[in-house]
Amino acid sequence: LLANRLLLNLFSAVIYVLVFRLAYVQYLYPVWGYMGYKYFVHSRWVSLLTIILAVFPILFYKARKIPSDFISIFVYIFIVAPSIISMEYGSANYNSVVLIQIFYSLSMIAFFSIKYHDKVIHRTKENAIPVNVYYVAVIIVLLTVIATYHSNMRFASVEEVYDLREETAEINTNPIVGYFMLWLANFFSPLFVATGLVKKNIKIVLLGFFCAIVVYMSTALKSAFFTPLFCLLVFSVVKKRNHEIISLFPSIVLFFSLLYFIGAAVDNNLAFVALSLFIMRTFGISALLTPGYITVFNSMPHTYYSHVRIINSITGMYPFSEPVLGKAVWSAYTGEA
């Protein structure tokens, strides 16, 4: 069974990497090249090495019925494999990125190889921090954020997202509030959703989603909803039978491959653009961002975490005039700055 699972995952990884390379060349670069996707042709040996580095980590994937294995395969599918491939296509000088490719591959191997307890450990010791402390803390954080952004808070439509972001960027000059926003989105929201699911308490789950809603209404960050929804997804998956967990990776690869080949077979401009948009917004985001960040930080000063406002308020080391790091990097990468 273990050997069959290994072969299935290896075969799926090879298919995924090869199909993603085709999708990059035929969809991502032609349609979204103006956004920053680049395409440099290298030798067949470079392509072979890239494929090996992208596929090899899957040999260490366990596919056990635990959340960490579920998360790790998503990291591989949406971040590591596309990033390794895009480093080849997005770099004119392959020698400048090959070590980074190796680092990505080894990091994914380490992630897959971490040993976890297969059985749940029941601890009799009470939590060191009383649960009421978390409730008091989240109330303080929520009130601070709402008091800061209340005049601009709203559910922004797709057309209004960037308008709201510009408005709120002008409001918050206090690094503490920005720090609270990070805690709200990345700690309190998933904490309460996960706790509510485990305890089967819908009120706690709703509190977690309320934290995400406040973040979105304040900053228009669509990713605010990703974490609580991902918690729901992980919770539902780990409750499934073992064979459903094992088939997760091959199923995603099959879906992606069918999507690509059906799109390639349909001679329709609208379908071509729609498919390109879907691939770019799901599987292709890391393939866009990774070469950009590598290129910029190979030639420009590092931030040393000074892009975090509370750290920059102490060190003053932030090297860009644009306060939002992503915008600063992308302006430098695309030549707008």
Predicted regions: what they are:
Residues 219-282:
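Loop-centered beta-sheet repeat module
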Residues 86-99, 210-235:
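Helix-loop-helix junctions and helix-breaking kinks within/between transmembrane helices
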Residues 1-193, 197-202, 206, 239-245, ...:
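Membrane-anchoring hydrophobic segments
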Residues 83-89, 199-220, 313-324:
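Cytoplasmic juxtamembrane regions at transmembrane-helix boundaries
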Residues 24-39, 161-175, 179, 256-337:
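Small-residue-enriched transmembrane helix-hairpin modules in multi-pass membrane proteins
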Residues 188, 224, 335-336:
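Short, well-structured alpha-helical interface segments that form or flank functional binding sites
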